[in-house]
Amino acid sequence: MSKTTPDRPRRNFYGRIKGKTLKPNQRTYLDEDLTPLAPGPVSWQDNPTRQPLDLNALFGGRETWLEIGFGGGEHLVHQAASNPGIGIIGAEPYINGVAMLLGKIRAAGGDNVRVHPGDVRDLFDVLPAQSISRAFLLYPDPWPKKRHHRRRFVTPEHLEPLARVLKPGAIFRVATDIPDYVRQTLEEVPRAGFEWLAERPADWRQPWGDWISTRYEQKALREGRVPHYLTFRRLEG
């Protein structure tokens, strides 16, 4: 008998899943809005055979973008409102952030956002190859201690599956205020099949033209840290 269910990989997850007690309205958002906004069966429990998501059915054939760790959702909702012809999937395991995003989606309206409240690696499993046109990684957890650097997103464990799901020529944006995270990003991302598009220092010092500053970035600026805006392009092959 052929084996149809792949072995579930062992994945350690680091970081918060839940913070302060949710407000009543946030619990309502989770109860009422999360299931309708799901991108499809992503978890191993719901999709043990890891069948690919049908993005054409999900977004009516629209181009698809991905935000990895959307925090409170400011940037994701801004992009969705500014680009109604694009479908955007956000992945975030921190349930308080998910609830904040759902509230913003209610206020903004629109039908082009889907939300995965969990580990983006599970989402990578079920995204079709070369299906994503743009990806965002904005102020990810810096894991500042050296022994924890392997927990950062910019490692082969995350970058290789990201590269698989991005179309050739797709754009990958990274924003961070941590100099050592910049260093690791510039070392690891090109190795995964990307080219850095900066031609001059101003290219990483200036925010993107469609950028909206997030709460985390405002906190970094108040504390004297310098944002870096890195743009990469997925290479062919």
Curated annotation (Swiss-Prot):
PROSITE patterns attached here? Answer: SAM_MT_TRMB (PS51625)
Keyword terms = Methyltransferase, Plasmid, S-adenosyl-L-methionine, Transferase, tRNA processing
Q: Which reaction does it catalyse?
A: guanosine(46) in tRNA + S-adenosyl-L-methionine = N(7)-methylguanosine(46) in tRNA + S-adenosyl-L-homocysteine
Binding of S-adenosyl-L-methionine occurs at: 67, 92, 119, 141
Task: Give me the residues that bind substrate, please.
Answer: 145, 177, 214-217
What are the EC numbers?
2.1.1.33
Q: Name one GO molecular function term.
A: tRNA (guanine(46)-N7)-methyltransferase activity
Give GO cellular component annotations, separated by semicolons.
Answer: tRNA methyltransferase complex
Quote the CDD domains the UniProt record gives. AdoMet_MTases
Which pathway does it take part in? Answer: tRNA modification; N(7)-methylguanine-tRNA biosynthesis
What the record says about family reads: Belongs to the class I-like SAM-binding methyltransferase superfamily. TrmB family.
Q: What does this chain do?
A: Catalyzes the formation of N(7)-methylguanine at position 46 (m7G46) in tRNA.
| Protein name as it appears in the record | tRNA (guanine-N(7)-)-methyltransferase
Lineage of this protein's species? Bacteria, Pseudomonadati, Pseudomonadota, Alphaproteobacteria, Rhodobacterales
